[in-house]
Amino acid sequence: RLHAIRTVLASCAVVLAGPAVARAQKVHQLPTTPATVAWGFYWAGAKPALTVNSGDMIDIETIMTNSPAGLERMGAKPDDIPQWMRDLYAGVPQDQRGPGGHVLTGPIFVNGADSGDVLEVRMLSITLPIAYGYNGCSGYMREFCRAPGDSGAGRGGRGGGGGASRIIPMNREKMTAEVAPGITVPLKPFWGSIGVAPPAEKGKVNSNPPHQHAGNMDNKELVAGTTLYVPVWTKGALLELGDGHAAQGDGEVDQTAIETNLKGRIQVIVR
């Protein structure tokens, strides 16, 4: 995926987190369940999954953009797929999914935020709750996706169009992953999609392209210790996070990163 992010770059900034300017009043828990996800969209009309105050912190959980069935087709062991992932896919009806494919946790309604404000989102910590991710190689890179003689058939996941998807084990102690024989990359987890609801007149927007609401920027610099500033377009901001990546280069050259589940703590401040 190659995104036109000119608008996003003009309206969002990534900087190193500085000293706290608003002491957190409370730490909230936001797991990923059928009742706490926005499946494939950012939308001003979405029902909040959580309501917080400016300065509050949220311990949040997000799911990778692939199904338990897809992961098993790639070779993941059934016992390595958390039960809550199966419950999520069983619990969200098809008519509540889309138009995009990202399963985002939220929305988070921030009291006091309204159109014209700026929402400061601090990435305080980001961790890897499972020891694997996957890569779906496709698009114009498809001819490089497979080993010689490998058709890629039946390997499932998002790597369609003649590509291939595969499980990538991760060493969480060393924070590395071997992505190919002899090629090891450092793990620097981040959320590929962080955004707020767009203006109400935009309706329910696809989670795939980033825009004025931020969203699917796939910015590998948004690791723990950084801060994102996003313009607010609707009451409460309606913040969503997802599309967790364990590692990524400068863009998703083969269409994905090392996609995985993430847990982390964020802090939200209205400016």
Where do the protein language model's features map onto the residues?
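Sec/Tat signal peptide C-region and signal peptidase I cleavage site
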Residues: 19-24
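Short, basic/aromatic beta-hairpin or loop at an interaction surface
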Residues: 25-38, 79-99, 194-208
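Conserved mixed alpha/beta catalytic, RNA-binding, or beta-rich assembly cores of soluble enzyme
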Residues: 189-216, 220-271
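Short, Lys/Arg- and Gly-enriched loop/turn segments at beta-strand edges
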Residues: 65-77, 126-137, 236-246
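Intrinsically disordered, low-complexity linker/loop segments enriched in Gly/Pro
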Residues: 99-103, 109, 124-223
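Bacterial N-terminal signal peptides
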Residues: 6-18
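A generic structural signal for residues embedded in beta-strands
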Residues: 60, 118-121, 230
